[in-house]
Amino acid sequence: MSAIVDIVGREILDSRGNPTVECDVLLESGVMGRAAVPSGASTGSREAIELRDGDKSRYLGKGVLKAVEHINTEISEAVLGLDASEQAFLDRTLIDLDGTDNKSRLGANATLAVSMAVARAAAEEAGLPLYRYFGGSGAMQMPVPMMNVVNGGAHANNNLDLQELMIIPIGAPSFREAVRYGAEVFHALKKILHDKGMSVAVGDEGGFAPNVPSHEAAIQMILEAIDKAGYVAGEQIALGLDCAASEFYKDGKYVLAGEGLSLDATEWTNILATWVDKYPIISIEDGMAEGDWDGWKILTERLGKQVQLVGDDLFVTNTKILKEGIDKHIANSILIKINQIGTLTETFAAIEMAKRAGYTAVISHRSGETEDSTIADIAVGTNAGQIKTGSLSRSDRMAKYNQLLRIEEDLGDIATYPGRAAFYNLR
């Protein structure tokens, strides 16, 4: 009864008004699964390829009709009749059908939409919530959220070169309370910015994008907001950075244009180390450029026991690249973005490899999102322990937080919230 009998792909719009792919999968029993894929603004060069039409007369060339056509023709022909409960076999069929290392023929946006929709249909068929379908009876750990409250870099139009400054409610007793901590700090920060005459408009991921004189000034405002909201920085709420350093790495230097600095990897590491000593920062994502593995080595040797060092553009949810990083002792954590690799099976493999190596895995959204909340279920289903899904505004971000609130309610007394223990790679 779980045989796939119909697949329909369509072009919809994401949270930035750009086209993305949605897919419906119908099973023999009449059950349907639907999924929509996200899209990133700052992307790693080795990510799986998101297929765009390139037709400048439609959506500035960003249409996805080619990817949709692939779903409705080639992919449909290949997977009709397959058992939706055999996720690994289905994903292998998609990988083999594409035939490239980076999904460039069919498009990772096409393969992922199908992979996700099939999983949703199979979960529905089994009468299980998606997180339980992914993780079985052992899925009970809620993720610690990394909440992006200040945007810079490619996610904003201000003088901050770092892409995200985040708050992390490590001292909350539950996920529900963690969300409350974050929301109250978000509103406190909004008032601080308003009182200073700064913009309170939000960026792609729901964070504020004020023009402040320096990164430290932004950090200090966040600390002020934590205090104003009645919380203790470092104990109840820690800080995280997403440098997205590839975006400001030019000719072997880290160029912080907003602060007039041009630094080599050692000098940039020294600045990050100074901030770590000065502020309650426990996570730094993409602290070095994706191609600067020597810089990553310097950063990891200096801060790898103190701080979670997350590879996003560095690892692009790819087990081959992650294994190389593990072997070379580069970073100590991986960011998991489902559309960087293009199937759920490959996503789960990256999470498992990270855990076996003592690396943490942070499940992540993209800057271009939809109302699809699959990553919330992945975070709980894999017991990942951490999720990064934006600020406390914009319904495309809240869709994930709200799904996690529902999951915690569903789990009841067996739900756990790891807090600081989610950062198990730190000594």
Swiss-Prot record:
Biological pathway: Carbohydrate degradation; glycolysis; pyruvate from D-glyceraldehyde 3-phosphate: step 4/5
Main location: cytoplasm
Lineage: superkingdom: Bacteria
CDD domains: enolase
SUPFAM superfamilies (alphabetical): Enolase C-terminal domain-like, Enolase N-terminal domain-like
Cofactor(s) listed in the protein's UniProt record: Mg(2+)
Enzyme class: lyase
HAMAP family (alphabetical): Enolase (MF_00318)
Function summary: Catalyzes the reversible conversion of 2-phosphoglycerate (2-PG) into phosphoenolpyruvate (PEP). It is essential for the degradation of carbohydrates via glycolysis.
Protein name: Enolase
Organism whose genome encodes this protein: Polaromonas sp. (strain JS666 / ATCC BAA-500)
